[in-house]
Amino acid sequence: IKTQVFKNNLSLSGSIEANEQVEIRSEVSGIVEAISFQEGSFVNKGQVLFKVNDQELKAQLIQATTKEGLAAENARRAKLLLQKEAISQEEYDVARAEHKSTQAQVQLIRAQIAKTSVRAPFSGKIGLRSISPGTYITPTTLVANLVNIGKLTITFSVPEKYASQIKLNTNITFSVSGTTQKYHGVVYAIEPEVATATRTLQVRAIADNKEGKLFPGTFANVELPLDVINDAIIVPTEAIVPIQNGKKVFISEKGMAKEVKVEASTRTD
């Protein structure tokens, strides 16, 4: 019998997910005027993805701007009349409030026009589109999915008996079906409580995917290291004999069997 380094790894099933994912939709309703992305391509944060026709909004802006100009002039005149005590404070306040209201309307329409250019909220890979130029869309219309696959998360559940051994920044290895390649990740988030329904603790790790070999939605076979024993004595399970107060094994000493009481730490498959 001799001591050796023993790594106690826990084998778990996990799910690979995009670090960032969003459904691209328009905040305004209207006819799609132009589409500026290629399906399945990489897009940059802030890049215009598609444009909704804004002619009606621009016409409304011209009308609102004209009203705002008239209201500004009325407010200016009302101020002069107030200084000459030709009108009451209340009449001036009404003119001033009307001016502020028209200013707000102009700002609102400009904000609506800005929303007709739908931009990527972050850099990533955009999926298949469900619209074409000329399609009438509303805020409920799903245009495409945008995912950041440069980094992926691996979510897995750990049985509650191991919960106290899970630490942040723990390095994990994992593999996916169809390949023997090993990938690496780091635990960055741990659920603060054990799920009562499953008696498991949910853990999440993050991994680089710069080469794009991994896909969100796939399963992962996770190897989670629990601890490392530098001077472990490894004994076959069948060599351990249960006794009333614990366990024992038999060793050979000077050609004779000797009974030794042992304390089992970790069992492997």
Identify the function of each model-found stretch.
Residues G127-L128, V176, T180-K248:
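Structural microfeature recognizing short secondary-structure transition sites
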Residues I1-S13, Q165-F174, T180, I233, ...:
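Acidic, gly/proline-rich low-complexity N-terminal segments at the extreme N terminus
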Residues T140, I234-E238, K261-V262:
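Short beta-alpha junctions and helix-cap segments that line functional grooves
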